[in-house]
C-alpha cells in the first residue's frame, strides 16, 4: 500500500483516557494519556464509576491534543480505531461512543480493537521490522496469557491464568504488606532492597508437563498466610524480603512457561506485553533465559507497556488492512476474548 494510513486511536478500557495518531501501524505521531492514578490511589484501586466520569471529562481534550501534537486534522485521518473490550464496561462505553460519533460525523471507517491485541501490537511500534510468527507473553493487572501470534490479528492462546492475573496478585500482595496502589511498581522497587530467597513461596505446577496455564491465587494466599502467622507471633515483617520472594515466585513461573511455549511451537522470538512487562526483574529474568535458550526477547518501552492509544492505533492498522471495519452498532464487550470478532 503506497499511501500512508493514519489512524486516530482511542483507549478508555480502565483508568487511562488516551488518544494517539499512528501511521502505518508503526510510527507514532502522538500518544496522549490522561491518567487517573492519583484519584484511584486514594481508594486503593480503580473505582469503575469514578473512572467512567473522568473518561467523559477527558476524552475530548486528549483527542484534540493528539491531533495537535501530530500536526494533523480530522481530514488527514483515514480511520478511527477504538478499544471495545475487554475492560470496565462503563469506561469502554465512553471511548466506543465517542469513536462511533466521530466515525459517523466524519464518514470515516470505524475499527474495533481488542485491548489485549493492542498490548501485543505495542511491539510493532518498538520494533519496526517485527513480523509474525512469534510467541507473546501478555501480563497485566487484568490478564495473563501466552499467545502464539501466527499472523497479524491471528492468535492461538497457549496458556492463561486459571484465577488471578499476575498484576492482580501484585496489587493484592502490595496492599497486604502496606505498600498501597498501584502494587506492581511498588513491589518492583522495594524488591531491590530485599532477599528473593528469604522466603520460599509456592509456584503452581500442573500435572500435564505441556500445560502452559498459570495460577497465582496460591502464592497470593501463601503470602497472606505468612503475614498472618508473623502478626500472630508478634514478629516484625521484612516487607522487602516478602516482596522480593513473592516476585521471584511469579517471575519464575512466567519465564518457565513462555520459554516452554517457544520450544513447543519451535519459535525463536518472544515479545512481552502489558503493564507488568515494565517490571525490571521480569525483564532481567526473561533476557537471561532468552540468552540461555538462544531466543530473542523483545520488550516495548515502558510507556508502551501500560495502557495507551498508540498500541490501539497499531492493532487498528492491521485490522484495517484486512478490511475488518466495524459497524456503527459496535458495542462495548467487557469480557471480550482474544480472537473474537
From Swiss-Prot:
Its cofactor is Fe(2+). One of its GO terms (cellular component) is cytoplasm. It comes from the Bacteria. It catalyses: L-threonylcarbamoyladenylate + adenosine(37) in tRNA = N(6)-L-threonylcarbamoyladenosine(37) in tRNA + AMP + H(+). One of its GO terms (biological process) is tRNA threonylcarbamoyladenosine modification. Required for the formation of a threonylcarbamoyl group on adenosine at position 37 (t(6)A37) in tRNAs that read codons beginning with adenine. Is involved in the transfer of the threonylcarbamoyl moiety of threonylcarbamoyl-AMP (TC-AMP) to the N6 group of A37, together with TsaE and TsaB. TsaD likely plays a direct catalytic role in this reaction. This is tRNA N6-adenosine threonylcarbamoyltransferase. The gene is tsaD. The keyword Lipid metabolism does not apply. Signal peptide: none annotated. Keywords: Acyltransferase, Cytoplasm, Iron, Metal-binding, Transferase, tRNA processing. It is found in: Cytoplasm. Binds 1 Fe(2+) ion per subunit. It is an enzyme of class 2 (transferase). Substrate binds at residues 138-142, 171, 184, 188, 279. Belongs to the KAE1 / TsaD family. It holds the Pfam family TsaD.
Amino acid at each position: 500500500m503506497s499511501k500512508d494510513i493514519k489512524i486516530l486511536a482511542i483507549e478508555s478500557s480502565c483508568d487511562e483516557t488516551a488518544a494517539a495518531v499512528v501511521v502505518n501501524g508503526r510510527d507514532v505521531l502522538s500518544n496522549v494519556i490522561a491518567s487517573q492514578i492519583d484519584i484511584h490511589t486514594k481508594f486503593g484501586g480503580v473505582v469503575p464509576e469514578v473512572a467512567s466520569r473522568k473518561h467523559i471529562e477527558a476524552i475530548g481534550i486528549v483527542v484534540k491534543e493528539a491531533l495537535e501534537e501530530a500536526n494533523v486534522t480530522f481530514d488527514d485521518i483515514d480511520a478511527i480505531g477504538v478499544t471495545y473490550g475487554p475492560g470496565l464496561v462503563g469506561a469502554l462505553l465512553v471511548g466506543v461512543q465517542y469513536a462511533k460519533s466521530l466515525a459517523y460525523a466524519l464518514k470515516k471507517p470505524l475499527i474495533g480493537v481488542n485491548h489485549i491485541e493492542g498490548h501485543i501490537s505495542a511491539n510493532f511500534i518498538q520494533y519496526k521490522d517485527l513480523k509474525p510468527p512469534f510467541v507473546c507473553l501478555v501480563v497485566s493487572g487484568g490478564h495473563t496469557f501466552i499467545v502464539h501470534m501466527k499472523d497479524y490479528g491471528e492468535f492461538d492462546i497457549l496458556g492463561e491464568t486459571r484465577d488471578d492475573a499476575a498484576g492482580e496478585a501484585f496489587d493484592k500482595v502490595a496492599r497486604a504488606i502496606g505498600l498501597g496502589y498501584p502494587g506492581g511498581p511498588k513491589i518492583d522497587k522495594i524488591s531491590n532492597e530485599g532477599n528473593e530467597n528469604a522466603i520460599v513461596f509456592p509456584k503452581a505446577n500442573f500435572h500435564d508437563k505441556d500445560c502452559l496455564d498459570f495460577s497465582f491465587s496460591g502464592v497470593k494466599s501463601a503470602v497472606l498466610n505468612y503475614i498472618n502467622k508473623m502478626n500472630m507471633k508478634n514478629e516484625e515483617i521484612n516487607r522487602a524480603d516478602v516482596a522480593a520472594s513473592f516476585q521471584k515466585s511469579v517471575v519464575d513461573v512466567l519465564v518457565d512457561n513462555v520459554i516452554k511455549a517457544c520450544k513447543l511451537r519451535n519459535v525463536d522470538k518472544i515479545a512481552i506485553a502489558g503493564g507488568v512487562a515494565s517490571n525490571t526483574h521480569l525483564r532481567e529474568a526473561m533476557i537471561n533465559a532468552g540468552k540461555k535458550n538462544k531466543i530473542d526477547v523483545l520488550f516495548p518501552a515502558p510507556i508502551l507497556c501500560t495502557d495507551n492509544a498508540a498500541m490501539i492505533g497499531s492493532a487498528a492498522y492491521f485490522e484495517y488492512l484486512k478490511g475488518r471495519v466495524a459497524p456503527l452498532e459496535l458495542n462495548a464487550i467487557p469480557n471480550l476474548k482474544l480472537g473474537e470478532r
